[in-house]
Amino acid sequence: MIEPQNNKNINNNIYNNNNNNFKMNQDENQLILNSKQLLEKIKISKKKNPQLKFIRVCWIDISNKIRTKAINIDWILNHEPKLIHVSITNVCMSLLCFEDSVTIEALKSENFGEAFLIPITTTKLNILPYCPSHIQIFGEFFYLDNESKKLKPWLLCPRNSLQRAIDRLKNKFGISLKGSFEEEFYLIKKGDNNNSSVASLLNSIEKLDHGTFANYHSLDCYGDILEKITNALEEQGLPIEQLLSESGSGQFEITIDYTDIMEACDRHIIVRQTINSIASYNGYIATFIPKPFDGLVGSGCHAHLSLWDTNDSNLTPDANGECGLSLVNQFFIGGLLKHSKSLTALFNTTPNSYKRLKPFYWSGCNVSWGLDNKESFIRIPSSPFSATDGCSNFEIKTIDHTSNPYLAMAGIIHAGFDGIENSIAPPPPTSLFDQSVLNNQLIPSNFEDAIQSLKENHYLCENIGNDISNAFIHVKLAENKILKELSDDDQILKLLELF
């Protein structure tokens, strides 16, 4: 992951900004104005592309399942509604990722109600390359407050949770988070037997490619499908940085350029959605699950992150700092390590996740940090200019595609906020290959321990939002109860095409 470097020194005033009164400035008048602007964009898009028929308004649920409702564009143009939106039942954030079972404990209210998904006009309105009669936009949830009779941000919306975290960090310290993800996935050729077993899945990919890391031949074997995937991503405005084959047969990684963290999460979703769709239309299954095959390496979505000030200068690098990082970024990392066990519940949400998180798997399960250390929870990537310019970003290695990126990033911001606010210095860094000699703590080795750590972490739950933390905990416990009753292979087959 390459980021522009900026050696601007940290301003000590960053610690003295006591403006921590943050709120989401989305009153009804602004929402209506935004809707009018969206209507004009739709008119322009329809005029340029007469084939357009539907606009998909998308949301990401607690379990990181991509969901959508599609509105007929002609209906919008004929009716010109005051507020373009779709209504969704308020149980939508209590559903399991693999079945529409309601988790009652996840809901604050026992009453049925509606949440209103309103398109976000600051996100891109993309024509879908794999379904060119549809355009897509992300939405955020609001609810009608009975007392004020006004629309308010819904507390069970993951996107709203991240926005609150972004506002908190910016208003208190004048800092914003930028980043991107390493998107790792497997491409599996659909077989004649419908890939009814994990063994048949493995056989189908090994027929094509006996992969190794950065294998030149792998890009040739999968050249046609990879070209369609990368073209589709670029058509949606995603700037691709790198493409490479990973260590597994049929395993690849695509990295997208860094950006503000909310947009990075949106791009992360678009990548998975696009790769899944293009693969399916071309006779492949694309899977992002953490550990589809025991004999092959797992897939993660490592997050590369950096801290920026209000002048859009990178606060992360400092050539004279530990591991080439500024003091503020070291404190941020101190907070992340302090909360690492609780964050694991947000990052790794299925039993399958923990088959990837093992020592010597380079998955970051050691609660430590270090320069170029692939065994540490936080790795500091070096560059040819690290000695003179410092290091421009830090990497969290454990995150996988079962995580809701908005909740994961909200957790990261609040953990880092704690580190900055309380000047939490991280332990000494290490770059030892074998960290077992250091007696480092490990992150939880199973979801039950991770979720218990999150439940007991009142600071994180309160700041992420007690309502959405409760929903996450109960939905994931319900999912994991079902998954734990299945064999490892049946778990894989159940999750294979969900992530």
From Swiss-Prot:
PANTHER family for the chain: GAMMA-GLUTAMYLPUTRESCINE SYNTHETASE, TYPE-1 GLUTAMINE SYNTHETASE 1
Highest taxon in the source lineage: Eukaryota
Enzyme Commission identifier(s): 6.3.1.2
Keywords, alphabetical: ATP-binding, Ligase, Nucleotide-binding
InterPro entries named in the record: Gln_synt_N, Gln_synth/guanido_kin_cat_dom, Gln_synth_cat_dom
Annotated protein name in UniProt: Type-1 glutamine synthetase 1
Gene Ontology MF term list: ATP binding; glutamine synthetase activity
Residue ranges occupied by any GS beta-grasp domain in the UniProt entry: 50-146
